[in-house]
């Protein structure tokens, strides 16, 4: 598959855009380097690049494009918003409608505030938790990405009872020392950390189903124990549902799993392909936020009509009958086909799946936490990624990212993808 124009444009981008990309996750550094594919059009489950090549898309913009690209209902909502003005700086009727839709779907979010991204939503949840508890420290789980704010770009220290270390240049150790990182799905390590730091902890930050080192579901009882131990210490549970909300059911992963947090952060899917974030939770906690309380949060673009109306339209599509049943059916079909192809060609993989989201790890060890995910063979993944790209299947260029099925994918797309996987595995 020729991509000469992509290579030319990447050279031009390098001259004006830092690193040639506007997010490092779009770089091909982790999959052998070279020019990333430059896309110029998307429709339904498909991309077309600047060289005219078509791809089946499982990237879904890292999750938000759950209804497929340019879904007519979502597109019409965006066009109507553009016609009537995209930004007012005032309240609008649509933000009330949308907030009510979210609260009906995720009842733990008794009061809601919109902002501009998942990063902002998580960052503000932490601020609100600190304001409510009067404490400072945060506990998070290793490998879980919660945005690029200083508060959460922190890696584990030498053990679960030690303070964190910065996971990026430019983050002071003084900030990292307020964050404790423990392994996901390890309740003993979490209990150990809480026994040492619980009285100083404002909140525990949780992806209820991990979506940032593939797809990893919680072990039975893990989330319930996290809630119990956290609340016994007087701290709050914050769910980062930026990836998971409306991905697995019409609501949050918390609905699917039957465990409620105190605060929830949202993003990605709820914007219908436009920038958005939201956070919410128990009324008495949320009332810490201005103008009702002392915790400040604001945003010029927050609640803008374009993003809000796109989000309303997206949820209206997802609320239609059988949408999530079809995600399950197609997700299972795809996963089974990948496993069959791996067995056929003697390729060692682990495959994790929840509904229409899955992850393929080139390792012989089951992946229940970040340590196991790190052991997946990145060189083999890089070869697989390039082979799939040449087959016309677009995946995220990282061994840690998930595949996402959308409402636009068809049985024919799944069959095409399985055949492509079979050919790719034959060449590994």
Swiss-Prot record:
Claim: Thylakoid is one of the keywords in the record: no
Cofactor section: pyridoxal 5'-phosphate
**So, what pathway does this thing act in?**
Porphyrin-containing compound metabolism; protoporphyrin-IX biosynthesis; 5-aminolevulinate from L-glutamyl-tRNA(Glu): step 2/2
Q: Does the keyword Transmembrane helix apply?
A: no
In the record, which positions carry N6-(pyridoxal phosphate)lysine?
A: 268
UniProt cross-references to Gene3D superfamilies, sorted A to Z: Aspartate Aminotransferase, domain 1, Type I PLP-dependent aspartate aminotransferase-like (Major domain)
Set out the biological process GO terms recorded for this chain's protein: protoporphyrinogen IX biosynthetic process
* CDD domains for the chain: OAT_like
Q: Name one Pfam family in it.
A: Aminotran_3
EC number of this enzyme: 5.4.3.8
Listed under subunit, the entry gives: Homodimer.
Q: Which HAMAP family match?
A: HemL_aminotrans_3
Protein name stated in the entry: Glutamate-1-semialdehyde 2,1-aminomutase 1
């Amino acid at each position: 598959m020729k991509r000469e124009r992509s290579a030319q444009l990447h050279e031009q981008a390098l001259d004006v855009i830092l690193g040639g990309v506007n997010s490092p996750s779009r770089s091909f550094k982790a999959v052998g380097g070279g020019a990333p594919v430059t896309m110029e059009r998307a429709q339904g489950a498909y991309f077309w690049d600047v060289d005219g090549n078509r791809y089946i898309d499982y990237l879904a913009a890292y999750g938000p494009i759950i209804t497929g690209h340019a879904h007519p209902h979502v597109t019409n909502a965006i066009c109507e918003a553009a016609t009537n003005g995209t930004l007012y700086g005032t309240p609008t009727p649509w933000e009330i409608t949308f907030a009510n839709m979210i609260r009906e779907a995720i009842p733990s979010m008794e009061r809601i505030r919109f902002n501009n991204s998942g990063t902002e939503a998580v960052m503000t949840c932490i601020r609100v938790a600190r304001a409510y508890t009067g404490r400072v420290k945060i506990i998070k789980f290793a490998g879980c990405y919660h945005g690029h704010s200083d508060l959460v770009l922190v890696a584990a220290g030498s053990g679960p009872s030690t303070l964190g270390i910065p996971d990026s240049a430019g983050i002071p150790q003084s900030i990292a020392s307020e964050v404790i990182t423990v392994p996901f799905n390890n309740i003993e390590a979490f209990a150990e950390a809480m026994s040492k730091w619980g009285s100083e902890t404002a909140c525990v930050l949780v992806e209820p189903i991990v979506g940032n080192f593939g797809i990893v579901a919680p072990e039975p009882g893990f989330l319930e124990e996290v809630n119990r131990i956290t609340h016994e210490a007087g701290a709050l549970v914050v769910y980062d549902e930026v990836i998971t909300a409306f991905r697995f059911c019409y609501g949050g992963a918390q609905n699917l799993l039957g465990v409620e947090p105190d605060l929830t952060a949202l993003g990605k899917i709820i914007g219908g392909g436009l920038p958005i974030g939201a956070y919410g939770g128990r009324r008495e906690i949320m009332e810490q936020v201005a103008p009702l309380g002392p915790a400040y949060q604001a945003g010029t673009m927050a609640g803008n009509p374009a993003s809000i109306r796109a989000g309303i339209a997206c949820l209206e599509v997802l609320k239609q009958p059988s949408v999530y049943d079809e995600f399950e059916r197609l997700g299972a079909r795809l996963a089974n086909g990948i496993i069959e192809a791996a067995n056929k060609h003697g390729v060692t993989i682990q495959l994790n799946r929840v509904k229409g989201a899955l992850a393929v790890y080139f390792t012989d060890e089951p992946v229940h936490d970040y340590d196991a995910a790190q052991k997946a063979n990145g060189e083999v993944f890089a070869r697989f990624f390039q082979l799939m790209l040449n087959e016309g299947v677009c995946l995220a260029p990282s061994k840690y990212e998930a595949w996402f099925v959308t409402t636009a994918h068809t049985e024919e797309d799944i069959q095409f993808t399985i055949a492509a996987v079979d050919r790719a595995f034959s060449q590994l």
